[in-house]
Amino acid sequence: MNVIEAAVATPDARVALVIARFNNFINDSLLSGALDALKRIGQVKDENITVVWVPGAYELPVTARALAKTGKHDAVVALGTVIRGGTAHFEFVAGEASSGLASVAMHSDIPVAFGVLTTENIEQAIERAGTKAGNKGAEAALTALEMINVLKAINA
């Protein structure tokens, strides 16, 4: 039996983070968590990290696709927060961000990690951005690093 598993330490990885500006009071914490995980746990060098800000979560997929197509990155991490409000806007933005990023992941040769919070309220978002429920930005960054190594092992 052949079992493929991989570590997250990836010192030579080139990682792009695409982050939504909308709800930046939450997203700043996701970014901090992702950067900490990349540098401290993944041992990724500063010069190998690119951060791209976009207006909102809806713009994450097209930007992730553009980054993936450059060939300059080993993974893309998408970060953002969509909080349910009183209209159907939440369903449209959250759904399109999710399906768009999944499509980019399926059609590119690099991992695209999903670090987009989709919450019912601000409190849930705060909890998932570094307080009671961990930091989903850090988790997405670690997922990207592990997947870089998993795909390398599969293709070896």
Swiss-Prot record:
GO biological process: riboflavin biosynthetic process
Keywords: Riboflavin biosynthesis, Transferase
Transmembrane segments annotated in the record for this chain: none
Stored InterPro entries: LS, LS/RS, LS/RS_sf
Catalysed reactions, as listed in the record: (2S)-2-hydroxy-3-oxobutyl phosphate + 5-amino-6-(D-ribitylamino)uracil = 6,7-dimethyl-8-(1-D-ribityl)lumazine + phosphate + 2 H2O + H(+)
UniProt enzyme class: transferase
GO CC aspect terms: cytosol; riboflavin synthase complex
Alphabetized Pfam families for the sequence: DMRL_synthase
Disulphide bridges: none
Record: residues binding 5-amino-6-(D-ribitylamino)uracil: F22, A57, Y58, E59, T81, V82, I83, F114
EC number: 2.5.1.78
Keyword Transferase: yes
Entry GO MF terms: 6,7-dimethyl-8-ribityllumazine synthase activity
Known function: Catalyzes the formation of 6,7-dimethyl-8-ribityllumazine by condensation of 5-amino-6-(D-ribitylamino)uracil with 3,4-dihydroxy-2-butanone 4-phosphate. This is the penultimate step in the biosynthesis of riboflavin.
Name recorded for this polypeptide: 6,7-dimethyl-8-ribityllumazine synthase
Active site: H89
The gene coding this protein: ribH
